[in-house]
Amino acid sequence: DTVLLNRISHDNAQLLAIVFNENVIGKAYTGGMCDPRYSVGVVMDHSPINRLVADTMAHEMGHNLGIHHDTGSCSCGGHSCIMSRVISHQPLQYFSNCSYIEYWDFITKLNPQCILNEPLRTDIVSPPVCGNELLEMGEECDCGSPRNCRDLCCDAATCKLHSWVECESGECCDQCRFIKAGNVCRPPRKECDVAEACTGQSAQCPTDDFKRNGQPCLNNYAYCYQGNCPIMYHQCYALFGSDATMAQDSCFQVNKKGNEYFYCRLENGINIPCAQEDVKCGRLFCHNMKYEQDCNYSDRGMVDNGTKCAEGKVCNSNRQAYQR
């Protein structure tokens, strides 16, 4: 790792050898991918048929990706599988169902960053070859051979985009052209959200936007804030479950104490008591409808910013009521 990594940036190294001391044709660290010490395999150049040596290399790289040898219950569609314990003289084409499961376990549990990012084109040292489905220097696209290409935007013969192409992908791109202006690309997800529409000049949907803060929502029961419609009932539900609702107004009066539990905000380590008009912007109080318990509160439960605290007023980030 001290020599090869300094020569060229790489995620994994597969080393070809002529002679092995043991009766094997390949070795690799299982689950070593992306580890600078263990992301490596050693493969014996055991056959004049390149495809068979490549199969062995794929097998060892499979080990690096956290995949073990197949067992009797594994299958890849009736063919000899790449991670089989037994060497086949027939070309191996597929990983088994067991291999796929182990691979995804490796990806999701260990989150190996080196194979989750797209390599720079400049990191590819082999000469660019149009038609190998690998986007390399000098290419705008590479969809494989002209016979196999399924990319409408790409000229498979030149690995360049067709002259008429406006876009390749995106919410506002369809068959390599911008979708007409006005077509909705992101519908509103909730009441305080707004729909976004394509501009006709870009493949990307415009930035997600929402209704202006202070606009009424929930039949004037609350006001929009940062795309949400915050109300104390929903906050009580999140803290105490379906039997909880907002407590009566008298419960909030203790927020004027300014002690460890009941206050509006913290300034220089001091709990500042709520002014009378701000009491519903401090500690949140809930009522348990099942057990008729009033004034329930949680150490995590301060009234959310933007919550309606009086007619025409909401709580701001300073835990103060202000005119919407």
Swiss-Prot record:
Q: Any idea of its EC number?
A: 3.4.24.-
* Alphabetic keyword roster: Calcium, Disulfide bond, Fibrinogenolytic toxin, Fibrinolytic toxin, Glycoprotein, Hemorrhagic toxin, Hemostasis impairing toxin, Hydrolase, Metal-binding, Metalloprotease, Platelet aggregation inhibiting toxin, Protease, Secreted, Toxin, Zinc
SMART domains, per the entry: ACR, DISIN
InterPro entries for this protein: ADAM_Cys-rich, Disintegrin_CS, Disintegrin_dom, Disintegrin_dom_sf, MetalloPept_cat_dom_sf, Peptidase_M12B, Reprolysin_adamalysin
* Top enzyme class: hydrolase
- Residues binding Zn(2+), per UniProt: 59, 63, 69
Residue positions of the active site: 60
Reported function: Snake venom zinc metalloproteinase that acts as a potent hemorrhagic toxin. Hydrolyzes the insulin B chain at the 14-Ala-|-Leu-15 bond but not the 16-Tyr-|-Leu-17 bond. Degrades the alpha-chain of fibrin and hydrolyzes the Aalpha-chain of fibrinogen (FGA) while leaving the beta and gamma chains unaffected. Degrades type-I collagen and its gelatin. Degrades the alpha-1 chain of type-IV collagen and its gelatin but not the alpha-2 chain. Degrades plasma fibronectin, plasma vitronectin and basement membrane enactin. It inhibits collagen-induced platelet aggregation.
Which tissues does the record link to its expression? Expressed by the venom gland.
Cofactors, names only: Zn(2+)
- Pfam family for this entry, one: Reprolysin
Q: What is the lineage of its organism?
A: Eukaryota, Metazoa, Chordata, Craniata, Vertebrata
Task: Give additional notes from the record.
Answer: Negative results: does not interact with alpha-1/beta-1 or alpha-2/beta-1 integrin.
Q: Name one GO molecular function term.
A: metal ion binding
Glycosylated residues are: 97, 296, 305
- How is it regulated at the activity level? Inhibited by EDTA, but not by PMSF. Pre-incubation with 2 mM DTT completely abolishes activity.
List residues binding Ca(2+) 2. 129, 132, 134, 136, 139, 142
The UniProt annotation puts motif D/ECD-tripeptide at 191-193
Q: Which family does it belong to?
A: Belongs to the venom metalloproteinase (M12B) family. P-III subfamily. P-IIIa sub-subfamily.
Q: What's the protein name? A: Zinc metalloproteinase leucurolysin-B
Q: How does activity depend on temperature?
A: Optimum temperature is 30 degrees Celsius with dimethyl casein as substrate.
Peptidase M12B domain location: 1-119
Q: Which domain of life is it from?
A: Eukaryota
Question: An example Gene Ontology cellular component term from the record?
Answer: extracellular region
